[in-house]
Amino acid sequence: PTAGPEETAAPEPSPEASAAPEASDAPSGGKTLVVYYSATGNTQEAANLIAELTGGDLFELEPADPYTDEDLNYGDENSRVVYEHDNPDARDVALVQDTVDNWDEYDTVFLGYPIWWGIAAWPVDDFVTANDFTGKTVIPFCTSASSGLGESGELLAEVAGTGDWLEGQRFPSRVSREDV
């Protein structure tokens, strides 16, 4: 079953998570950027750990109209996130900033997000469509209590149209240094 936005219970890591590249597998060369959207802080924690381990810079994706706890109540059919889920045209979530200063200096981009109903949380889409990933290696990562990475990375790569998108990694909602 697919789950709503970032659940709280953290199961054991799935086999598919261990088959994906680890943060330490980032290609060597230019600078590393860790871009993330975090609705409840779980993805932010994973992003902080990846940045620490890779020496990467952090860039947080912030919706211009931030999600409240009520907005993220996927059990409430009247919540914002359920409305956006049921109405794909409503998923165009504007960001405070959708481009990164000195974007051309980065060769490796880790892109993090929670899984919402089996796909990347839609605030990430605005960032992906606003940037040219040509010449960049992109490593998606997600946080989820139960859902795997699924096709979220492939779908974002399709939206981007450029870049070398690797398989990626799923982390449990309560990520630890050992998980990364």
Task: Locate the predicted segments by residue.
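Active-site-proximal alpha-helix that buttresses catalytic centers in soluble enzyme cores
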Residues: 1-180
